[in-house]
């Protein structure tokens, strides 16, 4: 399988609302899961080319087409690529050393708090993160990928009443990227066209307000060890199937036979729900909710996952939810 990187430069704020955001009180984040991207991609491709859409679905079912979640990148002096912090490391935080001075204790507490709140880590910093006592590397510069905000809107269908929409705006040089695993290179051209079409209408929520519009930042990048930097290291980790710790880079829905392997790992559950458009009633119908394993979940071996297929009341076509994972072998 060959791996490509698609980098997205967002032209407008994004709205990726999840039940997790509401529960935690987080107004908005830039977390766009692979199932959201796949659903949007299939919808756009079906309007563009029904046969191509069927080929995408068939390739995913056979494991020949894989997507990661949208992950952050930052373009500065170097092209920095970030991945989720492994869940098995979040519980292995050293306690505070009460023998230290008050000033040193405060610094240690701040470092501990930053460690607990960290969601993403640069690819080139993974080894140092996993082996903090062996590393002599300097601390990497931290970037703000953007900021959360709230915008006021007027609903003229209901007398011009005001309502508020949370969103996330990316900083200059920051954006999101997606790792695409592909067996059949013949699908790449159609995939790029579908993604470009998707960018015109936007991805995520509140697209009618202009949110989620993006363009591709250059052509798809084929990952190889010759790429150098974060991209070259990412390629090595994606191909590392022998590591005793395999981290998923996308939401995952395992099959029954894989539950035993999942139980040996470290993971967090994420509720996924949504709506599907019913052309007969001209309304959106709520589709079944499902709990999936978040990106960053770690297992002793790679758990393939599956593509879920649902039916919705009044909807004549099948409804899919992506639940397969892209993995990287961690350097433990």
What are these regions (language model features)?
Residues 1-332:
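Conserved active-site/ligand-binding neighborhood in enzyme cores
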